[in-house]
Amino acid sequence: MANCSTIKLCDREFSAEEVASTPWVNTALYRFDAKSLSLALSTCGSDNAQGEIYLTDTIEYFARNGEVSVYRVENPDELLTYSTKVELRSISRHFLRNASTLLREFPQHSNVISAFISRYGDRKAVIVRAPGRVNLMGRHIEHRGGSVNVMAIEAATVFVAAPREDDIIHLANVNSAYPEDEFSIGVAPKEVSTTREWLQFLSSEQTKAELAESRGSWGNYVKGAAYRFRDALDFDLCGMDVMVEGTIPVAAGLSSSSSLVVATAEALSALNCLNMTDSQFVDLCGEGEWFVGSRGGAGDHAAMRCSKAGHIVHLNFKPFSIGKSVAIPPSCSVIVADSNEQSKKSEGSKDKFNARVAAYEFAFMLIKRQFPEKTLVEFRDIAFCGSYDEIKHMLCSIPAKISRSELLKLLPESHEKLEEIFSTHADPGEYDLYGTALFGVSEIVRAANAPKLLAEHKFIQFGEMMKISHDGDRVSGIPAEKKGMGLEYECGAYACSTPRIDALCDLMNSTDGVLGSQLAGAGLGGCVLMLVDNDKAESVLKRLNEEFYDRLNLPRSAFVCKPSDGSKIFY
């Protein structure tokens, strides 16, 4: 108050000395009846920089009508109020419950809660559940502005997290294969707030050295989320002691790694009283996972955050929004079959993933330069900027394949951006621009059409789209017969499958009751996803076990998915 000469309240001015000497303080705790509050708010304007309605403006309305009463509190400690985020965080801890109480109330999580108590003691904590996910249509495109059609599965990553007084995050895992880890959230510089600044931080020598020292550590996914949330929100987050349990198969295309990111974000949000929109949450999670070296989108994180039990949810990106949810009818089942071929982003495959993303970028840069009359803001816009023939012509106008040196010659005005993209992956020799771009625009159309097909119960057509979609990732085997004209019937060549996964899809597509099958997840290993007639699900699983798993001497790893709710916090 010393820096203020006067303060104006309800048309009266008070000097700083008067304010400092007053025995009365407005604690900003107001009690209304609902009808009166609604009426008062309707009289308040929003003519301010934020365009907001202020609750305090209602006081003047009630005062004019003689309807204000003041309650004097003799003991300030009896007030439950706060003025800052730090005070709110401190208050919220009083409402947390001990782990032993959580153990009694949530017996389904008894294993991880008991492990938490054993490692950290019977402390006040929260439980966070972040499920795995499957994407029925819309692979490799959400970072280009495409949409996804997703559902969460029952397998999940579960955190039991207790707040700390410092900014240290300590991690322990029920599975002894994952060693304990610890780091300080405050290591990342505070001035990193925008996406561009975050990318610059990730490409810094300091970050590269940190990653090289901890390459392959499961804790890097937690670290990436914590760093990104702390920097973007410009708030000193409290640390936490965490016990983790995961039931999502690792490196199987069901997003076990992204579930660590989402669980971290949910736990930090709960313990720090963060208030974010779904869009903010999803975008920061997607960017947080870039810390491990990948440059994918936020589709997996969005699926985990926004899924709805019993439904397939349509999600849009750039900007993010939640679209239509379609209930899965009892006539259909979704089966996931693990190929038992792992794809680990930290062990080299990230170069291949990032090279595909780079091919999208390069194709888009060249198409925009070639067709300046088109309004193209995101890669997605190519798919809807003309007729089928026009779009094919646009794609054919750029080099089918191109090297880095050729790109630098063709785009001399973009050398800085090109070098920035080159730095995300090893040089593949040449980039398949046409195959990648054709897959992208066709998958964008398929994903956009998916809710209508599902809502109209056109499952045979949807299954055909799944087969074509997989052909865009296929590296071997027999592509599906092309049965129509239009972008949705094109497959392109993203080529992130494997011979084993292709063989599994071919086996399933020849099985009675299977409507369609495709690669699940980013690829280079992982699972196959199938849409199946429900009354044939048992026979499909039988053939899977006998003709795939048993024949290859692999553990039987297929299951029927039950669509579950998205991420949750249990207090």
State what each model feature region is.
Residues A16-R31, G45, L79, K324-S325, ...:
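A short glycine-threonine-serine/GTX helix/turn-capping micro-motif
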Residues R97-R133, M137, V158-G216, H311-Q518, ...:
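C-terminal nucleotide
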Residues V134, G138-E142, E245-A263, G513-L531:
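Glycine/serine-rich anion-binding loops at beta->alpha junctions
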Residues A172, G239-G246, M276-G288, G463-I468, ...:
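Beta-strand segments within the central parallel beta-sheet cores of soluble alpha/beta enzyme folds
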Residues F201-K208, A226-Y227, D234-I248:
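Glycine- and acidic-rich phosphate- and metal-coordinating loops
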Residues A232-G239, L268-L284, N534-E547, R551-L552:
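Phosphate-handling active-site elements
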Residues A252-N340:
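Fold-level recognition of mixed alpha/beta catalytic cores in primary-metabolism enzymes, strongest
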